Amino acid sequence: MPGDKVTARRILKMKGSRPIVAVTAYDYPTAWIADEAGVDVILVGDSLGMVVLGYPSTLQVTLDDMVRHTAAVARAAKRPLIVADMPFGSYEPSSSAAVESAVALARVGAEAVKLEGGSEYADRVKAIVDAGIPVMGHLGLTPQRAMRIGGYRPRARGRDEARRLLLDAESLVEAGVFSIVLEFVSEEAAEMVTRRVPVPTICIGSGRRCDGQIIVFHDIVGLSRHTPPFAKKYVDARRIMVEAVTRYAEDVRNGRFPGEEHVVHAKEPLEDIS
């Protein structure tokens, strides 16, 4: 039923049934809107570094940042599954560090965590799952490691990269993930992985053959400075908001705001107060 709480187990069971709808959101108002729209998953992404905090990349995002924004999203959204990104440096040092970071996110409302990387981090995935926290994998273009793996370019367009993608996906499944995000890989490679693994795949810029799709909230509504080519802008909210603030500024400068309807009056005369 649409009103039922979405869990990691429910997402797992959705593979092959109906498309999973996921949105990346970062704060109370965007999460509240996404929940009202009926999405299945809200990802509190470390992309908040660029989208919300103005950083040049995700590398500047800290665990404290993720905890703060995850808590805000969790206060707003009640039905969707809330997944929190594990930021750069929060799980790489050791499995114990990974569990500690995941627990910090779970304590403020994350119902699952997402981490980037393949077989090299399978032990971190297993440790977090063994601690009782569901894990979503992330393969293909992994922004935290984009420079190391050749920059922001499409992945798995050739056989060797596609084979590596599949092996990493299988490794994550063995470690216990309940789903895998495939970012900016060829549609054919995404389709192959989707067919070959038993967990749902959720695409971002990876074509139409996955079990679900995810886009950043700000890209959907037109609030991003730069919309990626694989995203679709459904409304130009930036233009609407600029127009609204411009009208407000004009009203203040011309004495039209506040109006009588915005004013609170005293209950008795105040002129003779000394």
From Swiss-Prot:
Residues holding Mg(2+): 46, 85, 116
GO terms assigned for molecular function: 3-methyl-2-oxobutanoate hydroxymethyltransferase activity; magnesium ion binding
Alphabetically ordered keywords of this record: Coenzyme A biosynthesis, Cytoplasm, Magnesium, Metal-binding, Transferase
CDD domains: KPHMT-like
Compartments in which it is found: Cytoplasm
Protein function: Catalyzes the reversible reaction in which hydroxymethyl group from 5,10-methylenetetrahydrofolate is transferred onto alpha-ketoisovalerate to form ketopantoate.
Official protein name in the record: 3-methyl-2-oxobutanoate hydroxymethyltransferase
Species for this entry: Aeropyrum pernix (strain ATCC 700893 / DSM 11879 / JCM 9820 / NBRC 100138 / K1)
